[in-house]
Amino acid sequence: MTDETPKTEVVQDPVSGAVVPAHPVGEETALRLTLTTPLYRGATIAMFLSGLGFSAAAPQIASFLVNDLGASLTVAGLYYLTALTAPVAGYLVGARSDRTGNRLGLFRLCALAGFLGWAGIAFSTQLWMPFVISAVVLGFAGAATSQLFAALHDQLAQTPRASNDGVVAIVRMALTAGWVIGPVAGAFLAAQTSARVMLFATALCTLAQILPLGALKDVPTSVPATAHGATAPAAPGVRVMAPLLVFTALYICVYAGESIKYAYLPIYMNDQLHLAPALSGAIIGIQPLVELVLMPVAVVVARRTGMMKPMIVAAGFGVAANLCFALTGTAAGLFAGQILMGGVWGVFAALGIIAAQRLLPVAVATASAIFLSSTALSSALGGLTGGLGAAAFGLPLVFLIPAGFAAIAVIGLILMARTKAARDL
């Protein structure tokens, strides 16, 4: 007798790795789950505030150093190197979080550090003060985001669902939405008041991250407590962390082009192509809009194909985008490049943090911190090679450098996809 019982289609939950039904009966959608779960809802609002505050200050800080504190353009440019302490601070916070399981407590401390840091910069009277504050205090403040994603992972892993990856994508989309609005809001506030007021507003946004989470506590995990004489788990060794470190290095190659693009694409559009300001603004602004649209699409595709294939394609988009910047010489070509870059970040923004946590499941806070803080290294790499490339090749051929970095990422991701660690993604 033939068994005609219908087979249930299954997928692998990218957060927990569990195999779950693709379309379970009564399954809550990711949006509904986010809205009805206090942690997910609070994390979404917190990440929007984080992106809003930081992106408001980032484009204005150099002008503040020059106009308010008397820095030269060269010295002001060196400020961005202070972010190089972020990976070290992020690793220390992440390792502490994995030993204790205290995700939300550390998140609140990091957010408080961010408030104190940005407020300190806003009230700085000497040029050295923002540099020291950024290197020491804001390095730890940046770990707030990684702790929140680690807390999300812990709760999502408690109940494997096909919609879990969608929850992470929604929270990540909120961070991106903050980055879309922040630069405009920051420029407007600075113009209407002053750079110091805008920087203090950034401090308030950073502190306000704490409010949506209220008094929520961490979800109990298998991490043993260190109190009462219990032995803390050993930090993962380099060999265990190797897949994560390789993936992060390839991500740095993809991301390095962003600092080059934002430094030289506006100059290229204004000084050589002589594009109208409105057209230049539209070219810059199209990328985050495409990114927001494609993030949920990337999640759906990854459920069917695994994460590596979309990320390989996205890195390929990075190659094509930078070739458009370097070789087309037209507004249409730059639009195409920015749309392709939206595809790059639509995929990596949605899937990158999940992949990083899956590559080091024994220490998800450490994994989150290493991955998210790596943008500081990529910005430094892009700034250094972009400066040398602009001097050697000029504009627009400097964009061949990030095209080369993205090509390295494509090759590396293809090779990594063949490893056991990546096949499980």
Per-segment meaning from a language model:
Residues G26-L84, S259-Q272:
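Helix-loop boundary and gating motifs at the non-cytosolic
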Residues F48, W128-T145, I252, G333-V347:
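Hydrophobic core of transmembrane alpha-helices in multi-pass small-molecule transporters
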Residues G77-A95, G285-V297:
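Central cavity-lining transmembrane alpha-helices of secondary-active solute carriers
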Residues A89-N102, A190, L294-M307, A390:
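Helix-to-loop junctions at the C-terminal end of transmembrane segments
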Residues G105-A119, F200-A203, K309-C324, A403:
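Structural signature of the two symmetry-related core transmembrane helices
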Residues L294, M308-G352:
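C-terminal transmembrane helical hairpin of 12-TM major facilitator-type secondary transporters
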